[in-house]
């Protein structure tokens, strides 16, 4: 369920940004991008398009270029560690890597799923493994500034979280 997945990605993103609090990180922008990061995912099942690219393009076309810029990087960042402090795109990218369907999982479990689903060809497998090295480095970067460990995310969210999400539309 893409809606449940996106809500979980949003909660993980908000938990991280709540504790990072670097100057310049826009919480509302992170919330919007996390909720919309898979906006064209369903369509991509039929078209085989890159849903990060098509989602970014759609959001640009309807007047949300900043959200689209982040959505376009939720699978693969344009630049890793582009600034001294984490960016909105890095937060959403990482949060997406921690959510498998609607469950928060360790990076290793998510990588295993992605390799199984998308890494059957040797070139794709190599690209995924390289991407995962960058994701592990991103995790270390983010959590160097956080008062909790990656394995604490599920527990912290279960205990309650300061982020607010709208109730899901039952029609979705």
Locations of the language-model features?
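A positional/architectural concept
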Residues: 2-15, 19-20
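General structural feature for long, well-ordered alpha-helical segments within catalytic domains
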Residues: 5, 51, 67, 131-134, ...
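Solvent-exposed, flexible loop/coil residues
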Residues: 6-7, 103, 111, 115, ...
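Charged catalytic carboxylate motif
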Residues: 8, 12, 54, 90, ...
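Divalent metal-dependent catalytic cores for phosphoryl transfer on phosphate-bearing substrates
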Residues: 17-121
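Charged phosphate-binding loop/patch that engages nucleotide di/tri-phosphates or the phosphate backbone
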Residues: 124-172
